[in-house]
């Protein structure tokens, strides 16, 4: 962080980091992000953060964690170790004291003594760390007040204007008193005040409501700046709550404007308001201030994109003339779109600086990812969004976002090929309803943002054009704007080097995904040469060519590389011992590929099912049982099923991350085939009385199968649970029923990987 405020725009734009550290309360339960992401137990994370090249970090020294029973019982060892480690690595901490919280159980956001109690804690922190210069005593006071006092999501679960305004006043007063207590120890301490900043757009009929929202968004900063009095546009609204005017006017006598205004900007920060509710999905309909209307993200409905964060930065600068920083830059999306979003935020900040806006930094938010923000942290569901590090491994694993951060911090040109494509928020398929044309949202797309939808991106070549897996990659690459090119054997025979070299020269891919192969396990016992050609020779040729041309390679292996003598899921490091020729071909492929290309990615998976073919086990079981016919499945062969969309998405993330070596990817739960059929039928509401369990030996298999081939991973559990996957599969099958009927009618049939 730049040390002198008058340096302004002479300093380069800085890259900061932020740790998702929310401790919010729902009823009497506290949800702690640091407990979920494991940082509470890992001092070694500091070294990981330092490796990103960040200059400053928004770092938690949280009231709820340190003083749950009062200031007399604080154990300072946790922040002592971590703040010391940050200083040793030259990273400036921006110390956060409350992050979407309501304090320990002995207070709350409606406690008249909340501000005094937080100020006492802030003073204790300053006494302990008198060198600390930058503070955010309360993160996002306006947003927290809305969620806790108006929407009823978090404690104290208010749903009225008075509770909303009172919780906002208490938090802002706490900021003032906390900074006063801190400055008694360190007079040079500086306030970095964060909040979400968006903008509301509307139809003409709702322009008054949009105007109200657009005035309300500034309210926390206005209070701290001493701008709220009878001249304020929301004065009548504020005093209509019944709160004494003196509580608002107190801030005029106790001005505590930030040294840096922190702008948190998300794809959901801006809103579109429309009274024509029949045009939109029902879950977006709401009622407020006498209106019934739709409230949703403009990006999903407006034909012309809004001006976005660059324009909002300029608005904040014109309003306050104080230095700014983007203090949260994150999007919950696939890996490439996370990178595209971060780069767009960085470019927007640079553009704003060129227009004279004093913006100091862009903060990459959620260095360790975040949990359950899809439900606004109202329940502990386990939904995880990774960030620069993915904590679903034994130790946090750097993703491609970390690589982009290092390039930005070092001033290098971002180099990842996926950055050549547009994010979903700029693509034609972003709409969830009929697009609305409006003059109120005027785009200011910078030329740097106008990256390609498909034309100029370097592609990913995908083999296996006739197979289920290859087609799935083609579908999902299209959904993620990754320019996948699906090739048949005629277009590229992977076992013929000249054919591979010709395709590589023609398409210039940055990655190749080998989704082809010999899949009939029983036929492989007599068709050995062909099996080994497709499953071992072909991947080894791809590996050699990819290594020579610096192309990333993803290829697939199988659970059938194991002998089944274990009674617990196999890990990547377990000894292989195939029982059949198919398994032997996969073992040989693994050996050859890694010999030729040590940076190749090999994914072992098993028993997959999905919505885009009608011949996988789960689909056949449900179809047969639904037709009131008998269906048999083995009771003594245990596998770990894999949902194809989950598999493909995780594989693409790992490929973008440049992961290498062998990974196991399944939806986790070991089940027998009959248990899988039973579980799926129950979820689909299909009668299971005609489901028969039989021993594997009764099915007349030619090739020997391992009795236990379930997979787990020591490298990372990346896929959702089997129950979650089956739920989504069944919903998808119902939605895809017309397409499935057309596929049956036309007689198309794809091969799948061996179960």
Where are these regions (language model features)?
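Active-site region of glycoside hydrolase catalytic domains
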Residues: 2-16, 80-340, 347-449
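NAD(P)H-binding glycine-rich loop region in Rossmannoid oxidoreductase-like domains
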Residues: 497-534
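Catalytic domains of carbohydrate-active enzymes, especially glycoside hydrolases
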Residues: 40-62, 256, 260
């Amino acid at each position: 962080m730049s040390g002198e405020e008058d340096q302004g725009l002479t300093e380069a734009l800085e890259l900061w980091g932020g740790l998702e550290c929310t401790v919010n309360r729902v009823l009497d339960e506290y949800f702690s992000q640091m407990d979920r992401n494991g940082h509470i137990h890992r001092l070694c994370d500091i070294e990981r953060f330092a490796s990103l090249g960040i200059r400053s970090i928004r770092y938690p020294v949280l009231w709820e964690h340190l003083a749950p029973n009062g200031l007399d019982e604080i154990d300072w060892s946790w922040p002592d170790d971590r703040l010391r480690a940050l200083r040793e690595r030259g990273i400036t901490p921006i110390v956060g004291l409350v992050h979407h919280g309501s304090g320990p159980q002995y207070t709350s956001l409606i406690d008249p003594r909340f501000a005094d109690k937080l100020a006492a804690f802030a003073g204790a922190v300053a006494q302990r760390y008198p060198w600390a210069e930058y503070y955010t005593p309360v993160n996002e006071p306006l947003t927290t007040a809305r969620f806790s006092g108006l929407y009823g999501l978090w404690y104290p679960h208010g749903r009225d204007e008075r509770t909303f305004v009172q919780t906002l006043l208490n938090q802002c007063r706490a900021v003032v008193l906390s900074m006063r207590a801190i400055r008694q120890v360190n007079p040079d301490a500086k306030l970095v005040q964060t909040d979400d900043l968006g903008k509301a757009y509307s139809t003409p009929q709702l322009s008054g409501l949009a105007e109200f929202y657009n005035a309300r968004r500034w309210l926390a900063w206005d209070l701290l700046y001493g701008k709220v009095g009878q001249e304020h546009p929301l004065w009548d609204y504020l005093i209509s709550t019944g709160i004494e005017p003196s509580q608002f006017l107190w801030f005029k006598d106790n001005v505590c404007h930030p040294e840096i205004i922190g702008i948190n900007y998300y794809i959901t920060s801006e809103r579109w308001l429309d009274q024509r509710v029949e045009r939109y999905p029902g879950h977006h309909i709401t009622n407020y201030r006498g209106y019934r209307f739709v409230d949703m993200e403009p990006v999903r409905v407006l034909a012309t994109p809004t001006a976005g964060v660059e324009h909002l930065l300029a608005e904040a600068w014109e309003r306050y003339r104080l230095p700014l920083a983007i203090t949260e830059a994150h999007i919950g999306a696939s890996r490439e779109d996370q990178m595209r979003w971060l780069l767009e935020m960085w470019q927007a900040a640079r553009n704003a600086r060129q227009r004279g806006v004093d913006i100091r930094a862009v903060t990459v938010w959620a260095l360790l990812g975040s949990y359950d923000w899809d439900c606004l942290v109202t329940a502990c569901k386990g939904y995880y969004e990774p960030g620069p590090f993915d904590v679903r491994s034994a130790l946090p694993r750097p993703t491609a976002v970390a690589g982009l951060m290092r390039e930005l911090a070092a001033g290098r040109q971002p180099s990842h090929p996926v950055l050549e494509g547009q994010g979903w928020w700029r693509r034609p398929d972003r709409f969830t309803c009929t697009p609305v044309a409006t003059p109120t949202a005027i785009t200011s797309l910078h030329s740097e943002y106008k990256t390609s939808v498909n034309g100029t991106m370097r592609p990913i070549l995908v083999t296996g054009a006739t197979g289920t897996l290859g087609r799935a990659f083609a579908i999902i690459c299209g959904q993620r704007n990754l320019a996948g090119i699906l090739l048949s054997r005629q277009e590229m025979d992977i076992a013929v080097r000249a054919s591979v070299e010709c395709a590589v020269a023609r398409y210039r891919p940055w990655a190749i995904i080998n989704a082809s192969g010999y899949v009939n396990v029983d036929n492989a016992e007599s068709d050995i040469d062909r099996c080994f050609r497709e499953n071992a020779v072909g991947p080894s040729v791809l590996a050699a060519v990819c290594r020579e041309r610096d192309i990333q390679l993803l290829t697939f292996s199988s659970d059938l590389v194991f002998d089944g003598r274990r009674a617990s899921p196999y890990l990547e490091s377990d000894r292989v011992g195939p029982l059949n020729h198919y398994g032997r071909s996969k073992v040989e492929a693994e050996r050859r590929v890694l010999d030729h290309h040590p940076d190749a990615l090999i994914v072992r998976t098993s028993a997959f099912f999905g919505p885009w073919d009608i011949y996988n086990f789960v689909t056949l079981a449900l179809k047969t049982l639904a037709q009131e016919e008998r269906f048999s499945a083995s009771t003594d062969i245990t596998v770990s099923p894999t949902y194809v969309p989950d598999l493909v998405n995780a594989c693409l993330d790992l490929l973008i991350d440049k992961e290498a070596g062998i990974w196991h990817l399944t939806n986790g739960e070991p089940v027998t085939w009959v248990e899988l059929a039973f579980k799926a039928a129950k979820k689909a509401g299909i009668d299971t009385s005609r489901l028969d369990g039989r021993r594997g030996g009764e099915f007349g298999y030619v090739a020997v199968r391992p009795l236990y081939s379930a997979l787990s991973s020591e490298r990372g559990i990346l896929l959702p649970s089997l129950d979650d996957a089956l739920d989504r599969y069944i919903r998808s099958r119902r939605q895809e029923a017309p397409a499935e009927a057309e596929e049956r009618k036309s007689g198309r049939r794809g091969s799948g990987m061996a179960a």
